Amino acid sequence: MNTNDAKEYLARREIPQLFESLLNGLMCSKPEDPVEYLESCLQKVKELGGCDKVKWDTFVSQEKKTLPPLNGGQSRRSFLRNVMPENSNFPYRRYDRLPPIHQFSIESDTDLSETAELIEEYEVFDPTRPRPKIILVIGGPGSGKGTQSLKIAERYGFQYISVGELLRKKIHSTSSNRKWSLIAKIITTGELAPQETTITEIKQKLMQIPDEEGIVIDGFPRDVAQALSFEDQICTPDLVVFLACANQRLKERLLKRAEQQGRPDDNVKATQRRLMNFKQNAAPLVKYFQEKGLIMTFDADRDEDEVFYDISMAVDNKLFPNKEAAAGSSDLDPSMILDTGEIIDTGSDYEDQGDDQLNVFGEDTMGGFMEDLRKCKIIFIIGGPGSGKGTQCEKLVEKYGFTHLSTGELLREELASESERSKLIRDIMERGDLVPSGIVLELLKEAMVASLGDTRGFLIDGYPREVKQGEEFGRRIGDPQLVICMDCSADTMTNRLLQRSRSSLPVDDTTKTIAKRLEAYYRASIPVIAYYETKTQLHKINAEGTPEDVFLQLCTAIDSIF
């Protein structure tokens, strides 16, 4: 079954409406036993005649007291005996069937039912006309989404839509509407508004502005399900801007905003819940858009003008590119992708400018996830080409359940992805420049976050390549618990590389090339090793022996941090 089949099945069976109704019932009823409650709800769905009979409020009781069971005539008579006077002259009419009860629903309580149905039926954008460019701006609460979205809209002449503001205005204008009163309570507690309701409001707004060249949507989607719904019912966005900010900074900004603006969802309890929702949903959402090559990440823990400068560079490159096409993968010199064991001289002028010019992908990408990263065991493995790092990392992964990350491999994977970032990296390499440390660190962080919860720690080889990288890693993520130096002579490494050359014939494993690589390694690694020696994190391993002997030394060193 492919994605379209799955989507068609869910839509045909009314599954989204069923789940929305069940969730609304859970949030309103707050049952002690949610499993038993859901079983009773599903039984009611069968009695109603299927999912197509379920409304969003089917399981939302108008009163909180439980009605007695009505299982047949005997139960009805027992109920009537309990609540009616014994006097036979009491004037009441007996019905063979209870009169219809006016059940609250979106159709009966609002005047939007026909509009909502039309929105489901028709395309949002006229297929005969060019579709406006769509930019989605996402990030944690307090990350500056509204500020940056407005700046983007103003710079490019786009229309700005704040999903949060759409919902707040709707709640304010329909305060007597039971559905929106319920949504107001949901939002006030820090939970997400119902997905279909939010999508409907966005679609209504988009239909009102069909002639816009571009649209910036702030605060949507919040999770992968919303992203799928947006693509299914509206379109695939042209660009997703992710504003990453440290968790503590988000809290500070939200508390300050609560004092200044008094938004109902900025209360302390709701703030905690919103941050928790963001933490749970952000990584899968970012990964989803990364796989589609749509997202760019920005460090939002800076001055807003600095952040916007980086965003505007990215938007210019993505939506208004130069006419020259980027080189294809076949045009790229493979030698410009670093070997996983190679540490190179980073003295290029471009590298010195990297942090300023290439902050497009951010320096603090995962907000609250950084706290989880800092709790993980992080081990750097430093060693020259041919020192045996790759072999030993494989064995350590198997023994300890670590995740092995190689900066060279991460760069290769990124270049193969054909993302916007890969185009930028390719352009840099084609000019003969080195990939800036900011991009390498960003690739590392994304890979680490993707493995959170499934690993006991990280083995990182080929990094840091200079002291500045190590300092930046410590500042942005945290210092490693252990730095292992694979101490091996130049002669041993040369012999190993020559043997590998005879078996696999890599282009650069000639004697002359090997000598250059070793020279570059020693020149760059000596300051790095000295830096970690002063921090008492360095553990030197004699890598001259057999793989088994080296592995035993490594295990002894790693066991010391557990």
Curated annotation (Swiss-Prot):
Q: Which residues bind AMP 2?
A: T407, R412, D433, L434, V435, G462, Y463, P464, R465, Q469, R517
Q: Which GO terms describe its biological process?
A: ADP biosynthetic process; ATP metabolic process; dADP biosynthetic process; pyrimidine ribonucleotide biosynthetic process
Tell me the protein's name.
Answer: Adenylate kinase isoenzyme 5
Enzyme Commission designation: 2.7.4.3, 2.7.4.6
GO MF annotation terms: adenylate kinase activity; ATP binding; nucleoside diphosphate kinase activity
- Give compartment(s): Cytoplasm
Q: Which reaction does it catalyse?
A: AMP + ATP = 2 ADP; a 2'-deoxyribonucleoside 5'-diphosphate + ATP = a 2'-deoxyribonucleoside 5'-triphosphate + ADP; a ribonucleoside 5'-diphosphate + ATP = a ribonucleoside 5'-triphosphate + ADP
Region of interest: NMP 2: 406-435
- The enzyme class is transferase
**What task does this protein carry out?**
Nucleoside monophosphate (NMP) kinase that catalyzes the reversible transfer of the terminal phosphate group between nucleoside triphosphates and monophosphates. Active on AMP and dAMP with ATP as a donor. When GTP is used as phosphate donor, the enzyme phosphorylates AMP, CMP, and to a small extent dCMP. Also displays broad nucleoside diphosphate kinase activity.
The entry's AMP 1-binding residues are R168, E191, L192, A193, G219, F220, P221, R222, Q226, R263, R274
Which GO CC terms are listed, alphabetically? Answer: centriolar satellite; cytoplasm; cytosol
Q: Where does ATP 1 bind?
A: G142, S143, G144, K145, G146, T147, R257
Q: Looking at the record, which segments are called Adenylate kinase 2?
A: 377-559
| Region described as NMP 1: spans on this chain | 162-193
Q: In which tissues is it expressed?
A: Brain specific.
Residues noted as binding ATP 2 in the record, renumbered to the chain: G386, S387, G388, K389, G390, T391, R500, G545
Spell out the residue ranges making up region: LID 1: 256-266
